[in-house]
UniProtKB/Swiss-Prot annotation:
Protein name listed in UniProt: Sperm-associated antigen 11B
Main function: Has antimicrobial activity against E.coli. Plays a role in the defense response in the male reproductive tract, contributing to sperm maturation, storage and protection.
Organism listed in the record: Mus musculus
Residue ranges the record marks as coiled coil: none
Keyword terms: Antibiotic, Antimicrobial, Defensin, Disulfide bond, Secreted, Signal
Lineage, top ranks: Eukaryota, Metazoa, Chordata, Craniata, Vertebrata
Pfam families named among the record's database cross-references: Defensin_beta (PF00711), Sperm_Ag_HE2 (PF05324)
Signal peptide interval: 1-26
Length: 113
């Protein structure tokens, strides 16, 4: 008799492991209709239209106050006429930028031909 019950209990255990939420299905429907309970001193944040704000507070950095040192520019000013380049607003396709013409950051572009 024990060998006959073993497959039955094994299949029952297997079904219970596959579907663990079925035993609590009736209590889930009951819990969904109840509003969430909060302690009296801690209510969730409310938005302008009454919706709950779900994001958390972000730690903000203090504002930068003078005197602070700006990073040095890492661009190189070159003599564009000497390198047979052309100063223009931006380099076109297949042109190579060799540096900048002035502090206005106009690139010095070399033509490929």
């Amino acid at each position: 008799m024990i060998p006959r019950l073993l497959p039955f209990f094994a299949s029952l255990l297997f079904a219970a492991l596959l579907f663990p939420g079925l035993s609590n299905a009736s209590s889930i429907n009951h819990l969904v209709t109840e509003p969430p309970s909060f302690p009296k001193d801690e209510f969730p944040a409310r938005g302008v239209n009454g919706s709950q704000l779900l994001h958390h507070r972000v730690k903000r950095l203090p504002p930068r106050t003078p005197p602070y040192h700006e990073p040095e520019p890492n661009y190189q000013i070159v003599n564009c006429k000497k390198s047979e380049g052309q100063c223009q607003e931006y380099c076109n396709f297949m042109e190579t930028q060799v540096g900048y013409c002035s502090k206005k950051k106009e690139p010095c572009c070399l033509h490929p031909f």
